[in-house]
Amino acid sequence: RTNELMLYKNMEYGEILKDITFLIDNYESEFYNKEDLRGLLFDCINELLELSVSHGFEGNLWHTYLTFLLASDENAYSTSCEIVGEIEGSLNEIALHDFAIFKEMFDYDFEELEKSLDADCLKIIMDYKSGNSGGKVFNRRVRDRICDLSRALAATQNVDHFKRTLTQFYKEFGVGKLGLHKAFRVEHPDNSDVEIIPITNIAHVHLDDLVGYEDAKKKLVDNTKAFVEGKKANNCLMFGD
């Protein structure tokens, strides 16, 4: 039913979803060659593994993939819910329609599909263990945020609960590259508009990691405390090479 999506359409990395949906709809059809369908299934698993390893995902990779799509897609509903959370109006009904489809995808049992195509490859990705704390694209903080949301969405009891859970995520973190990342760089491509590019894999640096700047760190901490307490404080910009 993914062709019935109204908001979450034309998503980046959405081809895997289209192919899996095609398999779900047609694995019992006599119109298609079983070996071709089986080959498509293994192609999907390959793409899912490549995406998951590069982003550091673990657990149920089908769920984390669907969650990644939902957390990344900037559409009329997801961008409207940033910061404010629940909204009013017809967008809610449209979003509920789309989330019903995603909930079906979350809850789908692949057992019969595996048996029909004589492939047990899906079992591997339902409880995948990552060997790294993060991936090449996402650091651990972003990876954990996606995996936590994935488990929360999988545990929802109905579509309304699914919608509330995802909407709360949009409220707390935002959506897309500006929501998932906290550092960016500005690029000026030739003959093109200025682009804001997320720095996708950054290390977490704490004040204790900075050696030899005790006086500067004390001034920064004191200034921050003054700001929090409502006293006079300076704007600060930290930079380094």
Protein language model features and the residues they cover:
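Pre-Walker A adenine-sensing motif
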Residues: D215-E229
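AAA+ P-loop ATPase mechanoenzymes
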Residues: R1-V211, D215
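Short, hydrophobic/aromatic alpha-helical segments in well-folded domains
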Residues: H206, N223-T224, L237
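Phosphate-binding P-loop
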Residues: I199-T200, A226-A233
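Walker A/P-loop nucleotide-binding motif
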Residues: Y213, G230-D241
